């Protein structure tokens, strides 16, 4: 018999998971000397990285992708990314910006 999950319980569980994610934000040099911002530490099994990347790209007006368990955004967005991740429900104390 399949287990019936209350949608409210599932939402609360996801909120708790968001508050426990240790997230690291840093930059890397891409091709031709371009900079890209990397976001690591979001559990791709629990959260849709593509959806999070889509929201961040829209807010930051940049390109990017979600691959290999991390989000890559074109350009240096370290100064704004922490605030945006907090708006998405992640805990500010667990976001490390380098």
UniProtKB/Swiss-Prot annotation:
Q: Name one GO molecular function term.
A: translation initiation factor activity
The yes or no answer to whether the keyword Isomerase is present is: no
Which Pfam families does the entry mention? SUI1
Write out the entry's keywords from A to Z. Protein biosynthesis, Translation regulation
- SUPFAM superfamilies per the record? eIF1-like (SSF55159)
Q: Hey, which family's this protein in?
A: Belongs to the SUI1 family.
Q: What is this protein called?
A: Protein translation factor SUI1 homolog
């Amino acid at each position: 018999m399949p287990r019936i999950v209350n949608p409210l319980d599932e939402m609360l569980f996801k909120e708790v998971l968001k508050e426990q994610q240790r997230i690291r934000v840093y930059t890397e040099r891409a091709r031709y000397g371009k900079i890209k911002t990397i976001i690591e530490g979001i559990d791709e099994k629990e959260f849709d990285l593509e959806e999070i990347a889509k929201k961040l790209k829209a807010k930051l007006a940049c390109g990017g992708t979600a691959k290999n368990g991390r989000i890559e955004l074109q350009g240096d967005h370290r100064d704004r990314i922490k605030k945006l991740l907090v708006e998405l429900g992640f805990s500010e104390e667990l976001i490390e910006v380098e």
